[in-house]
Regions:
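Aliphatic-rich helix starts adjacent to a transmembrane/signal segment
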Residues: 1-39
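Short, glycine/small-hydrophobic-rich surface segments
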Residues: 24, 38-79
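Surface-exposed beta-strand edges and their flanking turn/coil or helix-capping segments
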Residues: 36, 44-47, 88, 129
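Intrinsically disordered, low-complexity regions enriched in Pro/Ser/Thr/Gly and acidic residues
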Residues: 81-194
């Protein structure tokens, strides 16, 4: 009985350390993925907030009051595409030809996992083309890693912060000099809740 009493706490401590190591490795890999994606940004960068209300899944496209922080990041790779990175709720997505990229059932399972949406840019003014005939469209969607790669973990918090400056007489156009990404990886409880 004494041996079991000593081994059980040691085994639990070992599992806890192993889980923390996995969480740190996952967080490092996710940060590197974000860094690699943003590396090609050569147009605008927009800080926004991911959708958290299932009744308004397109709120990520709403105008924001802050130019320097958010839970989602949209940036352009001129002249090819616009990319949106977040970990929050995503609507069902279709491409411009009406083909499903992501069903609503698939989208609901991906809340808490890093995902990237890619949109075409309009040819006239290089603004993001998020809609066609009133429907949100994307030309590609991917997750950084399959859900199984998270090993029972998920992203509980993702936040982007920028250090920036504004030119004299410039209107609402800050110049980003550095960006910080804060990511928290957590474990869901036994019921699968956050």
């Amino acid at each position: 009985l004494a041996a079991v009493t000593l081994i059980r706490p040691s085994a639990q401590a070992y599992r806890d350390i192993q889980q923390q190591t996995r969480a740190q490795n996952l967080a490092d890999a996710l940060i590197e993925t974000i860094r690699g994606e943003v590396l090609d940004a050569n147009g605008y960068i927009r800080f926004t907030n991911g959708a958290t209300d299932s009744a308004n899944l397109d709120s990520v496209f709403d105008a924001q009051t802050s130019y320097s922080d958010g839970t989602a990041l949209e940036f352009s790779v001129y002249p090819n595409h616009v990319e949106l990175i977040d970990k929050d709720l995503v609507p069902a997505l279709k491409n411009s030809k009406g083909k499903d990229l992501l069903t609503q059932a698939q989208a609901e399972e991906l809340n808490g996992y890093l995902h990237m949406r890619f949109y075409q840019q309009e040819q006239r003014d290089f603004a993001p083309l998020h809609e066609k005939d009133g429907e949100k469209i994307a030309y590609a969607y991917t997750t950084a890693y399959p859900k199984e790669s998270y090993m029972g973990l998920y992203i509980s918090d993702l936040h982007f912060y920028a250090r920036s400056w504004a030119q004299e007489n410039d209107t609402d156009t800050p110049r980003i000099t550095a960006m910080t990404v804060v990511i928290t990886v957590a474990k869901r409880d036994s019921s699968g809740n956050d």
